[in-house]
A protein has these predicted regions:
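Nucleotide/pyrophosphate-binding catalytic subdomain
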Residues: 1-220
């Protein structure tokens, strides 16, 4: 979901099957080999804020990434208020987890508006304890309650929150975890995980040319 064209492609995939009711997006990744993932841009931006250095220019570049997606999709959507809040929270040292999570949060807002789905902030339903450990049972209960009666929703991946509202993230790539959590909560028949590579490979296709696929894999 790094560009407007990718959003359009994902939108077509989702709309191709009316049973695809709950969508869990990640933050914008690289548009090309020389590009930077938005999550890394957010980490770098917050590092400046943490060191009491000016971070307005770095934050502006992040905002421009999202605006290029919105403009490319010809949407009437403004993220001005969201970025004002982010700027304020960065200045108040809201934490690295908060900073990193904004990538998914903002992409979720765009995706929800693009699809016409309800936006559900995982900070309200995916719960971590005071030590930062994921609480599966509490999360399942909260998510079931939050999504009850919701026909279609976008739930950003990668993060949740402690009971006091402090944002906590999973490890990098945690949107896949969020997807499985949401699938369980809504008792989905199928959980589909779409990435830029089809299936499981025995090696990284960016390093090894045409690696063989793994047709069946066990898990525990």
């Amino acid at each position: 979901l790094a560009s407007a064209s990718q959003f359009s492609k994902v939108g077509k995939i989702i709309n191709a099957d009316p049973e695809r009711k709950f969508v869990v997006p990640s933050a914008p990744g690289k548009r090309n080999d020389k590009d930077t993932k938005v999550t890394d841009m957010l980490y770098a931006c917050y590092a400046l804020a943490k060191e009491e250095k000016s971070f307005s220019s770095a934050l502006k570049k992040i905002k421009e990434r999202y605006e290029s997606i919105i403009n490319g999709l010809h949407m009437k959507l403004s993220l001005d208020e969201e970025f004002k809040t982010i700027e304020k929270n960065f200045a108040e040292k809201a934490g690295e987890d908060y900073a990193a999570s904004r990538g998914e949060y903002l992409n979720g807002i765009i995706m929800a508006n693009y699809l016409g789905y309800e936006f559900v902030d995982p900070a309200d339903a995916i719960r971590f304890d005071e030590d930062g450990n994921f609480m599966p049972e509490e999360t399942d209960k909260l998510l079931k309650k939050r999504l009850k009666g919701v026909e279609r929703a976008v739930v950003p991946g990668f993060y949740g929150a402690k009971a006091d509202g402090t944002i906590k993230t999973f490890s990098r790539g945690g949107s896949d975890i969020t997807g499985s959590i949401v699938a369980k909560a809504v008792q989905a028949d199928v959980y589909e995980n779409w990435t830029d590579v089809s299936g499981f490979k025995i090696a990284d296709p960016r390093i090894i040319k045409n690696p063989e696929g793994i047709d069946i894999i066990t898990y525990s």
